[in-house]
Structures are given as structure tokens and as C-alpha cells.
């Protein structure tokens, strides 16, 4: 593994990439789901590609992606605009064609030398996604920033930062897929983008028909809790869940839950319990975990066009007092997670939009201990092919305050899930200890399997 001190990244001056053809000059409204306070932030992802001469015929990835971006923006022209605030801070998109920010860069390093430093929490993120001064605001700033960094091995890293009010993971994938198709020679995206944000406007009149714990202040909040503490000492680490960890966790689940329990559900229950223990929360205090649930697809019965690229999700919250969460077996937390996810349907999403309008776009609740988790293992970023084949890694690269993203990762040829966590430094040590304890195989199983066990932590 190379020492970080020897990495040198050379960047050219940022440039604005505009649509390749004239596009409509107009104002577009965001949906009431897009417009919530929770989404007014920038989300970074990273995609790492090996050299592949048999496929790319020595093409320059910077040139290919720059041109493909410009062509894709003809179809996704709102992303080349700027956000403005209207009355009551309502966001609108000024489709002025100013463009997205693009940075060409090169680094004197190979993918092999970078090793796991491209994985969450990615200590090199600022090198591969330069925060150009003045570009990271929500209002009046570029909605997308892309940096393409060529490596000495012939591979490259594409890092992207997106204003989350414009797209969710599924919407971003549509945009990236369109760019990739253009890079491989397509004349138009295979799935044409659909704006139609009015599909997720609040109803008239708005009416809250579901319980939304994610937006509610809870009783029993302690001023000494994590949410109200000084977060200047926050640290990030990533934790790996492979076959061994999942096997141990499943052994702790009651029979009636095993057949309906997903890997995501089980990891979420485990993290929620371990995090609550690590934060040493008042036993009477309410603690929550929210699962980001995509509204698309038949399962949730939300009727949206295939090319809809706006935010179409909710994050229903499971809630419990800290004491029963910590003292009960893992099945207690798991059942609460499953019940919260099951509340998500079209009515729930409509009720969220109505709540946001009626209550003036409240932030998610800031009282008590709160964790938000997002499953990106099936997001599809690993299938985006610009002409160099599939990426060796693709997805979110760090936890964002209370939000943790689950990403696919292969560890020693074993497929697993990597989860970055953000906690105060003292709590992080306790969290790792709790996680190791709950995923530790019994001694008799270790002897039977003739293998050692561990939970991987990456600083």
C-alpha cells in the first residue's frame, strides 16, 4: 500500500460543460418530495475503472466523458441549470443552460497502489473530487460537479457530486447510464428522462394520513444525547459484513422472522442496536432508525414513468426506547425495522408530501438518537460502462452525518456489504467492540469451521 504523502494530483482549471444543442430556457418546479430540507445537500459518489485496451482502443476517458456529458445534458437539461428560491423558500430550477462543473485531472498512481483507499470512507475523496471554491452551495451553484482523474496504469476515476434535491440514487443512475450510452456511441438514451415533478406534489387539500416518526420530536429526549452533543470529534470507519457475519446474525433470529428477513433488514437491526449501546443513551430515551425506501416498482404501488429521475423515496422510521432495544435479543430490533419498512406505499409517500407542505418543510427530527440507512447494493452504479467495462468500485464513498450507505464490496474474493459509519471517536471504539461481539461465532462453531473470524474496519 502506497503512503498518502506520495500522491500527486494535477488538475486543470474547472470548466462548465453545457448541453451540446440549444435547450429550453424555462423555469421548472421541484416536487414537494424534492424540496424538503433533508435533501438540501451535496452527495458524492466515486467510480473506478481499470484500463481495458481491448474495449476502449486507447481512447482518452476525459475527452470521451466530456463529450458524452454535453450530449446527455441535451436530454437532462435541467441539470445544467441553477436552483433559485421562490416565496416561502420554495425551490425552482432556472433552466438557463449554464452547465455543470467539470475538472480534468491526472494522478501519479495506479489503481493497484490505491488499494482500499478508494473505498468508504475514502480518505482521498478531496483529491479525486475537488471542492472548487464557491461551487458547493445549494442555491445558484452548479447542480453537478464531475472530476475525471487519469491514472498511470491507464485506468481512471470518475467522481461526481450531485445536488440531492434534483435526483435520488435511481435518478442519478438514469443520468449516468445516459452518459455511458453516449460515450459508447448511442445517439440518444435508451430510457428518455421524464421530469413531471408534479406527480409528487402535495394533494389539494393536503392531508396527513400516516404516522411519520421521522419528522416528529419525541418525548424523553435527553440533552446529553448524541444528537445534542458537540460533533467536532466525529470520525468515520467502514465495517464489512460477509458470509460469516451474516451467518452469525441469522442464528440470533427467531424462526418466524428468518424466511422474511432480508440482509438489509438484519444489518440495519444490528447497526441500530450496536450504535445505541455505543452511544450510552439514557434507557428511557427514544431512539430511531430510518430506512430509505424507493417508491418505484410494483411493490410500493407508486405509479411513476420509467424515466422519472426525481426523488421518489421516503424514510419511514422505527422507534423504540433505548432500554428494550439494548436488552432484548436482535429479533426485537429486526421486527421494528421490518414493520417500519412495510408502511411504505403510495399513500405513505403522498402523506409525506402533504406533511412537508402543511408543516413548512420540517427537517427530519433532530431530537434523540437517529440513524438513517440507505441500501445502495442494488443501485446499479456497478453496471455503468463508459467503454472501459464495469467499474472495480462504484457508489457513495462516505457516511454523511447520520446517514450510512450500504455498498457492495468483494473482500478476499468473497462478496459482502461495506457500511461506513460516522460517530464521535469515543463511541466509535465502543461501536466496533459491540459489533465484534454480536458477530462473533461461538467457540464450537469456530472449531467446526476451522476458520478465524473478524469484522473488518477501515479507517
Swiss-Prot record:
UniProt key word Transferase: yes
GO biological process annotation, one example: alcohol metabolic process
UniProt name for this protein: Alcohol acyl transferase 1 allele GSa
Tissue: Highly expressed in the cortex and skin of ripe fruit.
Listed Gene3D superfamilies: Chloramphenicol acetyltransferase-like domain (3.30.559.10)
Enzyme class: transferase
Free-text function comment from the UniProt entry: Involved in the biosynthesis of volatile esters which confer ripe apple fruit flavor. Alcohol acyl transferase that can use a wide range of alcohols as substrate, including 2-methylbutanol, hexanol and ethanol, to produce esters such as butyl butanoate, butyl hexanoate, hexyl butanoate, ethyl butanoate and ethyl hexanoate and, to some extent, 2-methylbutyl acetate (2MBA), butyl acetate, hexyl acetate and 2-methylbutyl butanoate (2MBB).
Entry EC no(s): 2.3.1.-
Higher taxonomy: Eukaryota, Viridiplantae, Streptophyta, Embryophyta, Tracheophyta
Catalytic reactions of this protein: butan-1-ol + acetyl-CoA = butyl acetate + CoA; butan-1-ol + butanoyl-CoA = butyl butanoate + CoA; butan-1-ol + hexanoyl-CoA = butyl hexanoate + CoA; hexan-1-ol + butanoyl-CoA = hexyl butanoate + CoA
InterPro entries: CAT-like_dom_sf, Plant_acyltransferase
Keywords carried by this UniProt record: Transferase
Additional remark text: The fruit of cv. Royal Gala exhibits a high ester accumulation, whereas the cv. Granny Smith contains low ester levels; this influences strongly the ripe apple fruit aroma.
Active site: 164 (proton acceptor), 385 (proton acceptor)
UniProt similarity note: Belongs to the plant acyltransferase family.
Any one GO molecular-function label of the UniProt entry: acyltransferase activity
